[in-house]
Amino acid sequence: MPTLTAPPAVATPATGQWTATIAADRAYFEENAIEGVEFPAEAQERTVTLPAPQVRIGRRSTSKGTNPEIDLADTDPGVSHSHALLTLSVDGVWLVSDLGSTNGTYLNGEQQPLGAGHTRQLKGGDQVHVGAWTTITLHAP
């Protein structure tokens, strides 16, 4: 008699695809408080699949013609319209670059932001911090 298994309760990304969990991070917010900005009372965590080869992080703007793949327009006022870029290299490694953002791009709680135009290699579990409170955690397949 064949063994039957129940389908997964949550849809999973296709094999080999990285995902990113986007969340409001109170600890990051408190360390980098921006005057006049309050932590959101109701912030929804979400997970997205990273479409290769590039994923732009920022805030949508029709007047500026920006439409990032990770759009934080409705959630984090500290995120620039063109904030950061995730790029899948030819050898299968994800990289992050700051695009000259106003408030910087930070990795794994480091005190110094990634310089504008500088690139760093990422691995599963790394956290990219942007804006006033957003933390993007990368998950390897």
Regions found by a protein language model. Give the residues of each.
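Intrinsically disordered, low-complexity acidic Ser/Thr-rich regulatory segments
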Residues: M1-P77, T134-P141
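Forkhead-associated
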Residues: A20, E45-A132
